[in-house]
UniProtKB/Swiss-Prot annotation:
SUPFAM superfamilies: LeuD/IlvD-like. Its EC number is 4.2.1.33. Gene3D superfamilies: Aconitase, domain 4. Belongs to the LeuD family. LeuD type 1 subfamily. One of its GO terms (biological process) is L-leucine biosynthetic process. Heterodimer of LeuC and LeuD. It comes from the Bacteria. GO terms for molecular function: 3-isopropylmalate dehydratase activity. This is 3-isopropylmalate dehydratase small subunit. It catalyses: (2R,3S)-3-isopropylmalate = (2S)-2-isopropylmalate. It comes from Actinobacillus pleuropneumoniae serotype 5b (strain L20). GO terms for cellular component: 3-isopropylmalate dehydratase complex.
Length: 200
């Protein structure tokens, strides 16, 4: 898994608070247990005009032509509230999002996003409002995230964010739980060679 050190991308300004996991990926799409294929169902109720997903809703921001290919999601407070389904970050990642910016995130959703190699950035409500205004006024322009410096550059303004050092290390180095374990493969092998066979 590639590390996420810096990222520049288009921003989708989803001007809504309390976007819950059922809005992100409705329950009827949760049967699969692999992480791929959920992106087409992302924001199903808002994004499509029909249950079969054949008609896009032209009034939903994700469908606006100027935001196609966006990799950064900007929302209001409490993103990812509701049920703890890990399919929500799966759907966002499968669609192509790498970074989310909001004043706050639901705790489980926040951790699930980090576990799925997405960066949830918390900024103040005032800072998020400034970014909304900039995105609306600067159609087609990208913003830049630097995880090493822990900054978000929007036009000529720099915002600073915080992230737990362990989580930052994992994102920078592309490490998931398996990758972290494999960093200790030699020690694990040495331990296993010393224990009785019936305990292996």
């Amino acid at each position: 898994m590639a590390g996420l050190k810096q990222h520049s991308g288009l921003v989708v300004p989803l001007d809504a608070a309390n976007v819950d996991t059922d809005a992100i990926i409705p329950k009827q799409f949760l049967q699969a247990i692999t992480r791929v294929g959920f992106g087409k169902h992302l924001f199903h109720e808002w994004r499509y005009l029909d249950a079969e997903e054949t008609r896009l809703n032209p009034d939903f921001v994700l469908n606006f032509p100027q935001y196609q290919g966006a990799t950064i999601l900007l929302t209001r407070k409490n993103l990812g509230c509701g049920s703890s389904r890990e399919h929500a970050p799966w759907a966002l990642a499968d669609y192509g999002f790498k970074v989310m910016i909001a004043p706050s995130f639901a705790d489980i959703f926040y951790n699930n996003s980090l576990n799925n190699h997405m960066l949830p950035i918390r900024l103040s409500e005032e800072e998020v409002e400034e970014i909304f205004q900039w995105v609306w006024a600067n159609e087609g322009k990208q913003i830049h995230i630097d995880l090493e410096a822990m900054t978000v550059t929007v036009g000529d303004k720099i915002y600073r964010f915080e992230l737990d050092e362990f989580r930052r290390h994992c994102l920078l180095n592309g490490l998931d739980n398996i990758g972290l374990t494999l960093q200790h493969e030699d020690a694990i092998t040495a331990y296993e060679s010393k224990i009785p066979a019936f305990l292996r």
